[in-house]
Amino acid sequence: MKLSILEAAALTAASVASAQDDLAYSPPYYPSPWADGHGEWSNAYKRAVDIVSQMTLTEKVNLTTGTGWELERCVGQTGSVPRLGIPSLCLQDSPLGIRMSDYNSAFPAGINVAATWDKTLAYQRGKAMGEEFSDKGIDVQLGPAAGPLGRSPDGGRNWEGFSPDPALTGVLFAETIKGIQDAGVIATAKHYILNEQEHFRQVGEAQGYGFNITETVSSNVDDKTMHELYLWPFADAVRAGVGAVMCSYNQINNSYGCQNSLTLNKLLKAELGFQGFVMSDWSAHHSGVGAALAGLDMSMPGDISFDSGTSFYGTNLTVGVLNGTIPQWRVDDMAVRIMAAYYKVGRDRLWTPPNFSSWTRDEYGFAHFFPSEGAYERVNEFVNVQRDHAQVIRRIGADSVVLLKNDGALPLTGQEKTVGILGEDAGSNPKGANGCSDRGCDKGTLAMAWGSGTANFPYLVTPEQAIQNEVLKGRGNVFAVTDNYDTQQIAAVASQSTVSLVFVNADAGEGYLNVDGNMGDRKNLTLWQNGEEVIKTVTEHCNNTVVVIHSVGPVLIDEWYAHPNVTGILWAGLPGQESGNAIADVLYGRVNPGGKTPFTWGKTRASYGDYLLTEPNNGNGAPQDNFNEGVFIDYRRFDKYNETPIYEFGHGLSYTTFELSGLQVQLINGSSYVPTTGQTSAAQTFGKVEDASSYLYPEGLKRISKFIYPWLNSTDLKASTGDPDYGEPNFEYIPEGATDGSPQPRLPASGGPGGNPGLYEDLFQVSVTITNTGKVAGDEVPQLYVSLGGPNEPKRVLRKFERLHLAPGQQKVWTTTLNRRDLANWDVVAQDWKITPYAKTIFVGTSSRKLPLAGRLPRVQ
């Protein structure tokens, strides 16, 4: 196979070198587990087996391999099996809407969903996105994201995910997945795993920025931290039935994420019981044999480098089976996993071809964009897929607003004599809402950050527009200055304003775009575009200054948040197309703010720990990013080091007040945990593998330049691969057990979707009474934290929450449960979850540091 023999040797050599050089090491785990169709996957699995059994080898390979960058209409597209009616599958970004399209919605970012703490809204957003993807003819949505989790507050893509807390992320991750897949589209849980920064994620990208590295960054983590922090939300995703997982660019303990047998074979497929397929991130595929045996099921976009016409899969995967390097059962399993996901979401009933092109807005163009080949046809049908989704977008935008501070300034009455709207972030991008490719600039109001995780706006309501409409209703005066450097005019407007509304922001994004020296990751946590000076100027001239922050995460506010003239602070995140309307709803009291901050607001950057690697530290080899902090990120770190935050995790004010009382705890299940034992079934093969002559290019096929095909040029396998080293001894480099299809031992922590079913048995029922003691209706989020009791554990960790709506004077009893996973730690020796003998205490309140109710749990096992 082309490059694969060399790559297998390199992998072995790298493992030895890693051990010798005392670098982090990822132990091998083989063979790659085969799907068995357990639980809710049963019917889809049976259908997948039936159809795959009818496929030839090259038809199976066609499902596993993208056709190449810009070769079809979508950012990723597989081959098809027309003989059996199986279409080419369209894969398209992003986690917040359809990228590179038109007449689609631009949804709030994942971080805003986290700020709502609302499971229903997470599901509704997922369902609405799924409907739009389906209506555009997209089969696989490349989202949602739980990687990055948010280890470092300045990580460039944190906003695509939810929160640095794994429990909050896991719940909302799962609800989003359910919504997408209930709309008939395969969801993709990404980026798996430890993809926590943009610096050094790709060699070419880093070299373009002047860094002389030859391998991508290695995220080095211990087993306990992996399970208790970063793997946690992916377990929730698997339990929710996610159809696809995208492996990441980075290395994990010096093994690439898309050929790391421990993370793919052991953790994801064996331990968590994942039944869907693993796809590579775009060009994160580094080998043929190595990746296939380590658990990679689909290569995206198919070519080794964009538009190269070469692939680690395609023809080379066909050759790998024919020469015995890759067992037939492994390719059969790849195809079964892909088709099972397809059937599970009902895509076969809803499938339509893509009605748009990612590469042009022209109505007509060549069928194959990059080589300008194939039929000249209608490539864009301009189908409007927005439906009524503006309603849920606006609601999430408003419900995600976090009222950080309110000294009586809010809500506004609408009768203010003069309202000043100050700051570039209130206005429009002079180039238009979509004027910067993939939103790669910070111009005008910030409603989404930058990168492949974006969508085109159908429109963007700015704060200036929405607030002006409000002021004019009350026949007041409204003056706006959206030039952050026009200090004189800002001061003039502020001095005559009854209330000054200051809009500031901080942006970030994906590493292929450099915005103002920010290579994806933020250079610092300060406000952008002179934001601090705008606030300073306004507070010097107006004693009623309300600051609205649109940002990708925390920013430093210590110099001004306590200023007596700052009477209100709101964090509005990245609210999408209805941005202005959403913030106006909150400012004018139509919506009572109920958002809670999904991250901690520290006094300094140092408060968070130095967790972003910005300079190579391993010569020109892979930069080594050591996760020495373990599970202590965000509020867990603040608690450990007794750091006092400005606003703690989970904080958020309301226009009303609430009281929590009456904590009750009941043991509902005292059964003991039973580790999984026994063996899997043997790997199955479906259909026969013929000799090489059966897999030659079909006669009369007109080949498309650079298109990735599964067929052979010749029955001479070496000639078909073009690999000059083909035929050299390579079985000594195949990892031990990698081709073994016999029954395998089951892992103790395995046994069902998301792991051992015993982990999800409810042990305790907890109830609390919440009372609205104020004069207006509002939402409160009771939060349950657990102290696991060990000397090296966080003081407390979030485990349960619920957003509740209460009328004035109304009481509600919130009842939740705690399962075994909620109370357990990962035992690195037993390789299983264990409830330790340390005392377990629960705390219930309205933030991580406002916890008025507490109770000790009886001991369970």
UniProtKB/Swiss-Prot annotation:
EC number: 3.2.1.21
Keywords in alphabetical order: Carbohydrate metabolism, Cellulose degradation, Glycoprotein, Glycosidase, Hydrolase, Polysaccharide degradation, Secreted, Signal
Annotated segments matching region Disordered: 735-754
PROSITE patterns for this protein: GLYCOSYL_HYDROL_F3
GO cellular component: extracellular region
UniProt subcellular location: Secreted
Organism: Aspergillus terreus
Pathway: Glycan metabolism; cellulose degradation
UniProt name for this protein: Probable beta-glucosidase A
Keyword Secreted attributed: yes
Protein family (similarity comment): Belongs to the glycosyl hydrolase 3 family.
Predominant localisation class: secreted
UniProt record, GO biological process: cellulose catabolic process
Residues of this chain annotated as glycosylated in UniProt: 62, 212, 253, 316, 323, 355, 524, 543, 565, 669, 713
GO molecular function (one): beta-glucosidase activity
UniProt enzyme class: hydrolase
PANTHER family for this protein: BETA-GLUCOSIDASE (PTHR42715), BETA-GLUCOSIDASE A-RELATED (PTHR42715:SF29)
Known role: Beta-glucosidases are one of a number of cellulolytic enzymes involved in the degradation of cellulosic biomass. Catalyzes the last step releasing glucose from the inhibitory cellobiose.
Catalytic activity: Hydrolysis of terminal, non-reducing beta-D-glucosyl residues with release of beta-D-glucose
Signal peptide: 1-19
Coiled-coil intervals: none
Active-site positions on this chain: 281
